[in-house]
A protein has these predicted regions:
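Arg/Lys-rich, alpha-helical DNA-contact motif
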Residues: 1-11, 20, 24-36, 41-78
Length: 78
């Protein structure tokens, strides 16, 4: 499922500038179609997790690493 950028901004309560910054850093990858930008549900859930970690004081790189970590590693089964 894909969401227009406006919907992603509203759901995650972030600014257009923040979304552009995340895109420039490779956190999310919008798809342009018919003059609009769309993001996948994976992008939305991934960015939501990153924002939660950042709200707890983690820098972007660490938040990103934790969100992208495989489930087994998180549960201590490495």
């Amino acid at each position: 499922m894909y969401f227009p950028a406006e919907q992603l901004l509203n759901k995650l309560q972030i600014s257009d500038t923040q979304l552009q910054d995340f895109e420039e850093k490779g956190v999310v990858h919008g798809i342009s179609k018919a003059g609009r930008v769309f993001y996948s549900s994976r992008d939305m859930y991934r960015l939501r997790g990153i924002l939660l970690f950042m709200a707890r004081g983690l820098p972007l790189d660490e938040a990103r690493r934790r969100v992208d970590r495989p489930t087994q590693e998180v549960e201590g089964r490495t």
